UniProtKB/Swiss-Prot annotation:
Its cofactor is Zn(2+). It comes from Danio rerio (Zebrafish). Detected in intestine (at protein level). This is Neutral ceramidase. It catalyses: an N-acylsphing-4-enine + H2O = sphing-4-enine + a fatty acid; N-dodecanoylsphing-4-enine + H2O = dodecanoate + sphing-4-enine.
């Protein structure tokens, strides 16, 4: 029987229509909301990376980054920076690295390398280019490769060919320079292999509470109208480059900031990358998740030196340590204790904490700038380079007035050192008179400076007339590199020494004026890269030179040094802007002295001897059974001389390992490049020595079972043979707890 259909009531029809309308409206609202969210995503630029959906408006650069270990010997060799031959290495705080950045515009390429070393010497640069030429022919040349040192004072020396520098670092030390040359070349190799299309963004900001002018009396001698243009007597600006691939993934950071890496003071005996190196370390550790420091993590963060000549990280300033009173403003000395009692201190309780604080300050601002960088660099890259005889430069001030540079000479205040450390005898900063006693000794031993040199350097009283001393080799260089590289609108002025704050400002302005007459430099950003290519001490302004504090006494080419450099760098900038680089004269090539003419005062280490009843790697002082986070786990081993380990690059002397119960295996959580580990070598008598390894247990350490291992080599000799043997020392297993109530 057919069912009878029921007619819908008016109420039911109304409800159905209302339901359909509400459904349609809901769908429409959801669609609009989805489209709006998608639109917002497209418009939003995240703070960490640029949107990969945005196609570069111009042909992208080829960019490559690379990092390589350049740590040399960590024992028994002089450290380079404080010019103290008694400050020899006795261990390892952090490893030293070379970081290379290559940019290619499709026609030309430029390379910037920043290395955790005191400075780049002429000898080092020439040996690097020998190695590069063997590998790459004329691809990497004097004009397109900049080599810069961070200026850590806690690296080993021995990579110079001029007598003065060889004296302070006990000669030309082959294992030291080989490690640095190999590390620099390897970092370029890695960057070369990793070249890919990418983008470069630039940003800048200010780093507070991280640098302090250690020679304010000199700075105040600059013209008042010039000083009034600046808020501070040191440069607070940090410039950051952000390197990404075309998908927007970050691959590198390169920055420049003006601060001396002397947070690790002159009492330090461990090789260390200091504050700039620590900033690189924590940035790379944050980016390279899952990699131990120094391993092949792909992200490279270079924190480079700038015009740091008078810029100290010891921001609490100098005080008389025996009274707590302020030091003398003019010569930085104290009524009791003289200049030795006048010491500047960093923000931390000790040099390690000060290093961490200054490094973190740079890291935090660089991270913010990296994340917010939106201004992109576009345009060609250029490199311009000349060799200049800085002993004979004529400076044209105007149509009627000229000046001359001088043969190198160091003033009496050079021997006074700075409030950051160094200095001997009764020498004081700010000395424009000299001392007949020391002049007499100099004349008897080294000979007096010529009248011409004395007149040229006025008002500097000359202590060492190094430009007139050439035994056994010249004491100072005469031929100096000047160089500029550009990437789009960015110009990097590679300077051969330590420019003071105002010197750096003047040269930046001069280069900027020359560049801005042409595209793409109409809004050029100019940075000073310090300690590049060759070391020539300090470069002050003419006015600062008159005061003759340490920096002025160390301006070796005389009062017109800065003016001569400005003239030369203006010439390079003009050639870049007008496309006439090829017309620049190459200049006189520097000497490359035969290795057999370079002296070495460092003796080979003697054979190692283990105490009776022990062997190498045995534990002499064992770890405690239990530690809590924040404490220091320490173990001492029978050791050989670390120099017997030879080339220690890409290895580790120390590991901290955590035991995994589930797998029954040990996992390395720290190596000797880690901030948390410290390796102390304790030299004894007659070939005996010890190695003390510390693990500064971080608050983030997991509770569990740990051990410390130490890897070394010992040397044994017989009448006809020398045998080098590896060994391993292992601590007892110990517990780490969040507190002592954990167990």
């Amino acid at each position: 029987m057919a069912s009878k259909s029921r007619r819908l009531s008016g109420l039911e029809i109304s409800l159905i229509v209302l339901f359909l309308l509400m459904t349609a409206v809901s769908v429409a609202l959801i669609t609009v909301l989805a489209l709006k969210q998608e639109s917002d995503k497209k418009e939003e630029v995240t703070p960490e990376e640029p949107s990969p959906s945005v196609t570069p408006p111009e042909k992208p650069y080829l960019i490559g980054v690379g990092r390589a270990d350049c740590t040399g010997p960590v024992a028994d060799l002089p450290m380079m920076g404080y010019a103290n031959t008694d400050q020899t290495a006795r261990g390892l705080h952090t490893r030293l690295f070379s970081r290379a950045f290559i940019v290619d515009d499709g026609n030309k390429r430029v390379v910037f390398v920043t290395s955790d070393i005191g400075m780049v010497s002429q000898r080092l640069r020439l040996e690097v280019f020998q190695a590069l030429k063997e590998k790459y022919g004329d691809l990497y040349r004097q004009d397109n490769v900049v080599l810069s040192g961070t200026h850590t004072h806690s690296g080993v020396g021995g990579y110079f060919q001029y007598t003065l520098f060889m004296i302070t670092s006990k000669g030309y030390i082959k294992p030291s320079i080989q490690a640095i040359v190999s590390g620099i070349v390897k970092s370029i190799d890695i960057a070369h292999r990793n070249l890919r299309p990418g983008r470069i963004f630039i940003n800048k900001g200010q780093v507070a509470d991280s640098n302090f002018n250690r020679s304010p009396h000199s700075y105040m001698n600059n013209p008042e109208e010039e000083r009034n243009r600046y808020e501070f007597n040191t440069d607070k600006q940090i410039v950051v480059l952000k390197f990404t691939d075309l998908d927007g993934d970050g691959i590198g950071l390169l920055s420049w900031f003006a601060v001396h890496p002397v947070s690790m003071n002159y009492t330090n005996r461990m090789v260390s990358s200091d504050n700039l190196g620590y900033a690189s370390y924590i940035f790379e550790q944050e980016k390279n998740i899952g990699f131990l420091p120094g391993e092949k993590g792909p992200f490279v963060a270079g924190f480079s030196s700038s015009n740091l000549g008078d810029s100290s990280p010891n921001i609490r300033g100098p005080v008389c340590v025996n009274t707590g009173l302020k030091c003398d403003y003019i010569n930085s000395s104290c009524p009791v204790g003289g200049k030795k009692a006048c010491i500047a201190f960093g923000p931390g309780e000790d040099m390690f904490e000060s290093t961490r604080i200054i490094g973190e300050n740079m890291f935090k601002i660089a991270k913010e700038l990296y994340g917010s960088a939106k201004q992109e660099l576009h345009g060609p890259v250029y490199g311009a380079h000349q060799w200049v005889n800085m002993t004979d430069e004529t400076v044209q001030f105007n149509s009627t007035h000229t000046g001359r540079t001088c043969k190198p000479a160091l003033g009496h205040s050079f021997a006074a050192g700075t409030t950051d450390g160094g200095g001997e005898f009764n020498f004081l900063q700010g000395d424009t008179e000299g001392d007949p006693f020391w002049d007499g000794i100099r004349d008897a031993v080294l000979g007096p400076p010529s009248n011409e040199t004395k007149a040229c350097h006025q008002p500097k009283p000359i202590l060492f007339s190094t430009g007139e001393m050439d035994s056994p080799l010249p004491w100072h260089p005469a031929i100096v590199d000047v160089q500029i590289i550009t990437i789009g609108s960015l110009a990097v002025v590679a300077v051969p020494g330590e420019f003071t704050t105002m010197s750096g400002r003047r040269i930046r302005e001069a280069v900027k004026r020359e560049l801005e007459v042409k595209e793409p430099f109409t809004n050029a950003e100019v940075v000073v890269a310090g300690l590049c290519n060759i070391y020539t001490h300090y470069i002050t302004t003419y006015e600062e030179y008159q005061i003759q504090r340490y920096e002025g006494a160390s301006t070796i080419f005389g009062p017109h040094t800065l003016s001569a450099y400005i003239q030369r760098y203006r010439g390079l900038a003009k050639a870049i802007a007008h496309g006439t680089i090829g017309e620049l004269p190459k200049g006189p090539e520097p000497p490359f002295f035969d290795e057999d003419k370079l002296f070495n005062q460092v003796r080979d280490p003697v054979a190692d001897v283990a105490p009776v009843g022990t062997t190498f790697g045995d534990v002499l002082q064992e770890v405690n059974p239990v530690y809590k986070v924040g404490e220091i786990a320490s173990v001492t081993f029978v050791s050989g001389n670390p120099r017997h380990s030879g080339d220690i690059r890409d290895t580790t002397l120390v590991t901290v390992e955590r035991f995994h119960n589930d797998t029954g295996s040990w996992e390395i959580i720290h190596n000797d490049a880690s901030w948390e580990t410290r390796f102390h070598w304790i030299k004894g008598l007659a070939g005996r020595s010890q190695a003390k390894v510390e693990w500064h247990i971080p608050q983030t350490a997991q509770a569990g079972t740990y051990q410390i291992q130490y890897f070394g080599h010992y040397k044994q000799t017989t009448e006809n043979t020398t045998v080098i043997t590896p060994y391993v020392g292992t601590s007892a297993a110990f517990k780490v707890a969040r507190s002592f109530y954990y167990f």
